[in-house]
Amino acid sequence: MSTLRFHAIKESLKYKPVLVEKTERRSDLFGKNVFNENTMRHYLTKDAFIGVMNAIQFGKKIDRNIADQVASSMKDWALSKGVTHYTHWFQPLTGSTAEKHDAFFETIGEGMAVEKFGGNQLVQQEPDASSFPHGGIRNTFEARGYTAWDPTSPAFIYGTTLCIPTIFVAYTGEALDYKTPLLRALHAVDDAATAICKYFDKNVKKVTSSLGWEQEYFLIDKMMAASRPDITLTGRTLLGHSSAKGQQLDDHYFGSIPNRALNFMRELETECMLLGIPVKTRHNEVAPNQFELAPIYEEANLAVDHNALLMDIMGRVASRHNFKVLFHEKPFAGVNGSGKHNNWSLSTDTGVNLLAPGKTPMSNLQFLTFFINTIKAVNTHEALLRAAIASASNDHRLGANEAPPAIISVFIGEQLTKVLEELEGVTKGKLSPKEKTELKLNVVGKIPDVLLDNTDRNRTSPFAFTGNKFEFRAVGSTANCGNPMTVLNTIVAKQLKDFKKEVDILIAKKDLKKDEAVFNVLREYIKASRDILFEGNGYGESWENEAKRRGLSNNKTTPEALKARISKQSIALFEEMDVMSKVETEARYEIEVEAYIMHIQIESRVLGDIARNHIVPTAVKYQNVLVENVRGLKEIFEEKYNSVSKEQINLIEEISNHIAGINANVTKMINARKAANDIQDIEKKAHAYCNNVKPLFDDIRYHCDKLELLVDDEIWPLTKYREMLFTR
């Protein structure tokens, strides 16, 4: 292994920045490999184009005749670009994308062949559902599942394959992917938000949920990554002493991007442009060899698809540049981990961002309505929102003084807090003309001025308002954005639905005017949501105590957090909003708990293997060198032997203690794992892995990392942190 380590270092030093050819302007490249609206205008008949646009904009069904026309046009377009295969591209609950490629090629007899692709192939396919996570919805012998075309996300060409974004459902109709519940949640929030918008503008017919993700990642040399079994098998380092220099000088964040990494980014951005992914920002992040990529905001379903596609593209482009891209939330101890901030907002088909203040008191009242309802939604469902970002890898990051804590709270800034306090003082019931004027001019009317200079940022907040959007910062870098976006849009949809019901009752039964009813309900929501608002330091112990006093959940581990998924409140929520049935909700819980168990199990096995098969033999080898040295000293320095060999003997003893510590803890870990595996109840098994197996990782790592500081660098088998983080 030490030979492999030094070979990796030697090879990595030979790498030069991979030449990236100059391309056309970004605006000319954008969407060239996407069957987007512009391409459809060229290839589709008028009827087919109208049919597809109605499906995209209004959710109308596409009849089979139109589907055949679309399929034929898609095929012609794809063949003109050298495409040979097509696939239904979907997002099963594995966390990555899935695809099965079929050729357009069909034989027609007499040694002849043609390219064929019809409406049947476009609209529906049948992959094996039993081979993907299904949470008990399907038996292994009940293999049938369906992928069905999602016309709201355009088909695209990836390599020589036409990729058709699809949903993935069981034969019995239950969702087996991230996209299906997301589409349902987006429909729910559209219905609920549009109904509220009609209080303020009768012309609004549709409300769209927007998402702008910020993808953080590490780039390390491909050869060095290959020399680390832990990175290869788990995506992170399970051991390794921190480098003497890490991020303490703050010299990496926004620094000059290294040439190799920059050329990787340039090629990546070209690929993204061709696929219609509107990437805009790139920069160094806080930790060495950590970077960030962010796009322009898009409709949420498309943004989720684009992020899933991007992560796949990044891995392929990184390999061409002799890099390995690490998405794990905490690949290296001692430096910052990676997240994926989800910037979320709602906008109307009339061009209004509902989370941005307007120019009139009425438009500002609309802003406050959506702003306060979002806060109320988070207050009611904070535990479910925490469950939406729970994973074995994100547990390493949350609450680690570099990322938001595991306690969900909302930050809105001092000035907006004052606005809410003033609204809280609104008179109950009817408002006098003077009160209305005061409220509209001096409270609601001044919101744009308040936001102009006073939307400060609090990086310790997991859910923060940043001027014209909410930023969900607790999402992990490996996550499929569909999960948190499904939950967020669902809870907001439910809250808006309840809000409308309460406002309509006040208008009908209390004889209040519309704005009076809105103010009255908002006032009560502000009072009910005080506990979720927090402006202070989320890292402090005092916040944990305060959050407990407020009744907020503090689920620090995934097994704890995921329970909120199957609470009576959550199941009822998803059923009422037609997002997921009870069966689907419970299946997702089971899938996510199983994924947690498997991740910890794999890491445990890999750590035990590295510790016993790589670290201990290396330590013994070095110890033998020291023993021979001590023997030689005894032969040469008979009288002074004790004094001249003292340090070597102490070192031999210290190494022995660490070897004993490794072996004892690995044995404990194996026994704890066996005991956990004997548990049939999946929830109890997850807690056993969390509480009995995982804590031993740190004990084993402690001894291994201490040995790294003691053993001769020439024979140490694993590539070290300083080599991985500072080779560029």
Report residues per predicted region.
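N-terminal hydrophobic targeting/anchoring segments and the immediately downstream early-domain regions
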Residues: S2-T23, T140-F156
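Short linear, low-complexity motifs centered on an aromatic residue
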Residues: G95-M112, S130, R228, G235-T237, ...
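Active-site-proximal loop/turn and secondary-structure-junction residues that shape catalytic pockets
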Residues: I66-V70, F90-P92, N120-Q121, F168, ...
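Histidine/acidic residue-rich metal-binding segments in metalloenzymes
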Residues: Y15-G119, V123-N139
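Composition- and surface-driven signal marking solvent-exposed, interaction-prone regions
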Residues: I231, N307, E329-K330, A356-T360, ...
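Glycine-rich, acidic/polar active-site loops that bind/position phosphate-bearing ligands
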Residues: A143-F327, N336-G339, L346-E590
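Active-site proximal loops enriched in glycine and acidic residues that flank catalytic Cys/His/Asp
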Residues: I66, F90, G118, P295, ...
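C-terminal amphipathic alpha-helical interaction region
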Residues: R523-R728
